[in-house]
A protein has these predicted regions:
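Aromatic-anchored helix/helix-loop segment that forms the rim or "lid"
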Residues: 284-312, 316
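Short, glycine/charged-rich beta-strand-loop motifs at protein surfaces that mediate ligand recognition
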Residues: 300-301, 332-334
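Catalytic alpha-helical scaffold of carbohydrate-active enzymes acting on polysaccharides/glycoconjugates
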Residues: 1-38, 44-53, 69-72, 77-230, ...
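BRCT (BRCA1 C-terminal) phosphopeptide-binding modules in DNA damage response/checkpoint, repair
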Residues: 52-62
Length: 483
């Protein structure tokens, strides 16, 4: 065996952090496990911090992740696996908005990690080629997720009216306790993508409580004539108890910015529930911020216009960077009162011919199909040949080959695709990483942290709060005192 008989890709992964495997899967760079396919590729990635060596075969080149670690000021692998959240702020012109989101910007960390790995790989004679995140010829994908917490007939109707003509780009996540008994609302949602937002609008700390709430919400929507697909946790919160509940119920996908935001989809905890991160800034937090920062002299109308301008800019920035554009908002008191925010945001997205406007359910199906594709890349006489398998029937896949500062984007048409390694066609400059909006740290409020630790809320009826756990007992006792 010599190095020319082995494919340039897939990468062969030895004992490496889970976050590297996840990042490569998100990126679409093919890889195999060394324990399963030891001769699967020319380059072996290993971590001497966790193993005794590369155990490379003749003709293989080993790349040690320890060399990457030495250039970092923090452990990117650990940060990518972190599941805690923190209060984070952003500035929209003069208005400072804040939300509780994932502690780390996982997109920025993943991009830094993979840029460093790409450099090491190319210096060793390898290439960087990936399966595109979107079907060919799309550059990005767009969805507006509407979270239906409470029900206001006027705001509900105004929101759906504003979305007319753009239904294929809308996903509705519905709280069943407030909507399942509203036949006029159910009737308008039929034919749309509907997901569950729970029965009660609360994300619990215990797996059994989350499972019961999600199951009840799904069953209530089904009884009303809807077939929900997917889940979005109230307040965007994530914890392992929620993931356990979602896994036990076989939920297809979920979306919580408390775990990740503005990032490519991934599977938390090596499970089966696909996480679809969204952009965390919405109309609601803009209105709240304007009311709190009275010294700015901004009314609700001005705050709504700032939010619209932000949505339009984030569409431009994310489209340029080739990122998913997944926005969200609420009808009651927000999009329903300022429907032009939704209407003009949707119109902006519709102006891009290479932007795939789709539901989160359809995007989740695409992402799963993308993850099943296999790629091998061979080099001969200056030509690269990509051999593929298990490509989806519903969509054309895209190959993205990195050549210096440029990227060539080619359709994956057929099981074999060949092109020049030095001068590929359909080549364009690689976009710079997106920097807008720039976050800043916000001090944690001890009272809010304590409430979350105790799982404090007033949504669940007192008689339905279980006292089998200490949190449930404490919450029920405090509710009896306060109520």
């Amino acid at each position: 065996m010599n190095d020319q008989s082995l494919p340039l890709l897939p990468l062969v992964l030895g004992r490496v952090p889970k976050s590297l495997r996840r990042s490569l899967a998100q990126e679409g760079v093919p890889f195999v496990d060394q324990a399963v396919t030891p001769a699967g590729g020319r380059f072996v990635i290993f971590d001497s911090a966790a193993s005794t060596g590369a155990h490379a075969l003749p003709g293989q080149t080993a790349i040690d992740l320890l060399a990457l670690r030495r250039t970092w000021t923090c452990d990117l692998f650990a940060a990518l696996e972190d599941e805690t959240d923190v209060r984070r702020g952003w500035r929209l012109d003069s208005l400072a908005v804040s939300e509780t989101v994932a502690r780390h910007d996982k997109r920025a960390l993943r991009e830094r990690l993979l840029a460093d790995l790409r450099k090491r790989l190319e210096n060793a004679g390898g290439i960087w080629l990936r399966l595109g995140a979107f079907p060919f010829p799309y550059r990005s994908a767009f969805n507006f997720r509407i979270d239906h917490d409470d029900y206001d007939p006027g705001d509900f109707a105004a929101t759906l009216d504003a979305a007319k003509g753009h239904e294929r780009a809308i996903s509705h996540y519905v709280c069943a306790s407030t909507h399942a008994e509203r036949p006029e609302a159910i009737a308008r949602l039929k034919g749309s993508h509907v997901g569950s937002h729970g029965y009660w609008h609360h994300t619990y700390r215990e797996a059994a409580e989350n499972a019961a709430n999600i199951r009840r919400g799904v069953e209530a929507l089904q009884a009303a004539g809807l077939e929900p697909s997917g889940f979005a946790a109230p307040h965007g919160r994530f914890n392992r108890s929620l993931l356990e509940a979602l896994e036990s119920l076989g939920v297809d996908h979920s979306s919580e910015f408390g775990l990740a935001y503005d990032e490519l989809p991934f599977f938390p905890g090596d499970g089966r529930v696909l996480q679809l991160p969204v952009h965390p800034i919405c109309l609601g937090i803009c209105l709240e911020a304007a009311r709190e920062q009275q010294d700015l002299g901004l009314g609700d109308d001005e705050a709504a216009d700032l939010c619209l301008a932000h949505f339009q800019r984030i569409i431009v920035e994310k489209h340029r960077a080739g990122e998913p554009i997944f926005l969200y908002g609420h009808p009651e008191g927000r999009l329903g009162r300022y429907p032009h925010v939704l209407r003009e945001t949707l119109a902006t997205a519709a102006g891009y011919r290479d932007l795939w406007r789709t539901t989160l359910a359809r995007f989740a199906a695409w992402w799963r199909a993308r993850g099943r594709v296999t790629l091998e890349v061979f080099e001969y006489a200056g030509q690269l040949t990509v051999r593929s398998g298990r490509t989806p029937q519903e969509h054309r896949c895209a190959l993205e080959y990195f050549c210096g500062p440029d990227v060539a984007r080619l359709p994956l048409d057929g099981p074999l695709v060949s092109f020049s390694a030095a001068a590929p066609i359909l080549r364009s400059p690689l976009p710079a990483p997106r920097a807008y909006p720039t976050p800043f740290d916000q001090a944690d409020d001890f009272r809010i942290s304590l409430r979350r630790y105790l799982d404090w809320e007033r949504v669940t009826p007192l008689e339905e709060i279980s006292a089998r756990t200490w949190r449930g007992w404490a919450k029920r006792t405090l509710r009896r005192i306060k109520d």
